[in-house]
């Protein structure tokens, strides 16, 4: 019986030494070409929307929003746009969002967006609406990747999901 306990003891010790050796870290510096300090390429993703399928690079940082509904949705998602259409009843923003919109450039109204102002903001994403801006979609997508919701009426939750997807959230 003593020899059996001794053999179990030796096996346990051997196993612990073996596992410790396998788990040791190698402190050698990474190969230069193996992604050490080189920035990773941003990935592209696609968003299917009312007008097309749009490919977007990385996570957009400079967003222009072309609907009042969209402005409030972006703010709810924690995204402050660089440009937005004027609120219907605000000067230029609704009172309840005015504090969050400080520094945001007005880019026209929902029914009359200013393409030159939008282009000057150098957005990496434009979010609009087919019902309001279908006529300028081709021009907008030349400025930046552009995603349009189908309508302003109906299920706001669907538009919200589309905006979140366009923002890579």
Q: For the regions a protein language model found, what residue spans apply to each?
A:
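Bacterial Sec-exported substrate-binding components of ABC uptake systems
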Residues: 2-13, 19-69
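Conserved functional loop/turn residues at catalytic and ligand-binding sites
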Residues: 21, 78, 122
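Short, flexible loop segments at the rims of nucleotide/cofactor-binding pockets, characterized by
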Residues: 40-43, 59-60, 101-108, 124-126
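Stable alpha-helical elements in mature extracytoplasmic
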Residues: 70-73, 114, 132-136, 156-159
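A short, structured surface patch at a secondary-structure boundary
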Residues: 70-117
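Short beta-strand->loop
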Residues: 83-85, 127-130, 148-151
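Proline-aspartate-enriched helix->loop->beta-strand connector
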Residues: 122-127, 145
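Extracytoplasmic substrate-binding proteins
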Residues: 135-169
């Amino acid at each position: 019986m003593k020899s059996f306990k001794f053999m179990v003891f030796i096996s346990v010790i051997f196993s612990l030494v073996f596992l410790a050796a396998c788990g040791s870290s190698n402190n050698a510096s990474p190969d230069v070409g193996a992604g050490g300090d080189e920035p990773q390429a941003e990935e592209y993703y696609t968003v299917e929307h009312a007008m097309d399928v749009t490919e977007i690079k990385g996570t957009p940082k400079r967003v222009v929003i072309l609907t009042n509904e969209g402005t409030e949705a972006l703010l709810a998602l924690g995204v402050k746009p660089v440009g937005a259409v004027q609120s219907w009843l605000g000067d230029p923003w609704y009172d309840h969002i005015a504090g969050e919109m400080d520094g945001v450039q007005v880019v026209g109204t929902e029914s009359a967006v200013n393409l030159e102002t939008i282009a000057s903001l150098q957005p990496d994403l434009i979010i609009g609406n087919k019902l309001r801006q279908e006529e300028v979609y081709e021009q907008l997508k030349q400025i930046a990747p552009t995603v349009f919701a189908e309508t302003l009426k109906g299920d706001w939750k669907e538009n919200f999901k589309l905006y979140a997807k366009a923002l890579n959230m």
